[in-house]
């Protein structure tokens, strides 16, 4: 299965964000949602949907998202993405390419990825920022169907995230898990946790002092959480990263949604 999702935004004469170009092939669908009380006023809320029960060997998901200048998009997904069992040497792939226009804002939080027994999955995400643009991007992955006794029973998981501005990298984050060759339950790895989440925030309009204050606020929020291991780090330039280890996907999802609202409220783009 080769599936494509292409989505772009435009700004109406009333200053509201709408879908512009929109193309999907099965099993993808996109549904726009009613406006709700949000710090990003006049933004577009949408849900990325899929009718697939999961990814199989040789499946390729190709996602392209482009935001026009001065537009704002909050994009969520409908359900977990499951990578099904496959023969040794096979794998499924997802490629995501995102481009943010000047003064645009994107909050993209897909549901968790679940790695079934004997599965292999490779994903790359490349995001190009523009002047004064703002990004909140999250990823959550589960090491298997833990309630079925699957812990690190998958074969391979590889994830590469690159965020750049004017062809200059702001952050590059790579995860490579090979359970048969790596001690992934050791100290400083996953230990006894079953879910990992990463949330990256980049706002090129913020200076280092402002970002440091936001890091302190999120560290205080993290200190209130239970049954999670949370770290908040300031990037070298214009942003921060939150990394979480937990025993359930939903608590990471809810935490990231809460952090997203905190970060949106501090946006300096109206």
Curated annotation (Swiss-Prot):
Keyword Flavoprotein set for record: no
A GO CC term assigned to this protein in UniProt: cytoplasm
Keywords tagged on the record: Chaperone, Cytoplasm, Nickel insertion
Annotated InterPro entries: UreD
Main location: cytoplasm
Short name of any one Pfam family annotated for the protein: UreD
Organism superkingdom: Bacteria
Cellular localization per UniProt: Cytoplasm
Molecular function per GO: nickel cation binding
Family: Belongs to the UreD family.
Record note on quaternary structure: UreD, UreF and UreG form a complex that acts as a GTP-hydrolysis-dependent molecular chaperone, activating the urease apoprotein by helping to assemble the nickel containing metallocenter of UreC. The UreE protein probably delivers the nickel.
Function per UniProt: Required for maturation of urease via the functional incorporation of the urease nickel metallocenter.
Protein name (database record): Urease accessory protein UreD
Upper taxonomic lineage: Bacteria, Pseudomonadati, Pseudomonadota, Gammaproteobacteria, Pasteurellales
């Amino acid at each position: 299965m080769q599936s494509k999702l292409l989505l772009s935004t435009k700004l109406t004469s009333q200053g509201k964000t709408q879908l512009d170009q929109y193309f999907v092939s099965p099993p993808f669908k996109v549904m726009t949602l009613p406006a709700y009380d949000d710090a990003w006023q006049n933004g577009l809320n949408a849900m990325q949907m899929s009718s697939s029960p999961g990814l199989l060997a040789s499946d390729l998901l190709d996602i392209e998202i482009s935001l026009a200048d001065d537009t704002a998009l909050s994009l969520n997904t409908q359900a977990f993405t499951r990578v099904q069992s496959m023969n040794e040497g096979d794998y499924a792939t997802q490629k995501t390419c995102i481009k943010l226009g000047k003064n645009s804002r994107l909050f993209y939080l897909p549901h968790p990825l679940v790695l079934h027994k004997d599965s292999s999955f490779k994903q790359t995400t490349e995001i190009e920022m523009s002047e004064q643009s703002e990004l909140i991007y999250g990823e959550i992955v589960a090491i298997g169907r833990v309630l079925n006794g699957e812990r690190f029973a998958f074969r391979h998981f590889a994830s590469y995230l690159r965020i750049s501005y004017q062809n200059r990298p702001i952050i590059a984050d790579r995860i490579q898990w090979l359970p048969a060759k790596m001690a992934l339950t050791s100290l400083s790895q996953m230990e006894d946790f079953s879910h990992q989440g990463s949330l990256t925030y980049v706002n090129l309009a913020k200076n280092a002092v402002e970002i440091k204050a936001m890091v302190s606020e999120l560290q205080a929020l993290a200190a209130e959480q239970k049954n999670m291991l949370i770290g908040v780090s300031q990037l070298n330039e214009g942003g921060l990263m939150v990394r979480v280890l937990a025993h359930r996907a939903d608590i990471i999802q809810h935490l990231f949604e809460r952090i997203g609202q905190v970060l949106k409220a501090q946006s300096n783009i109206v």
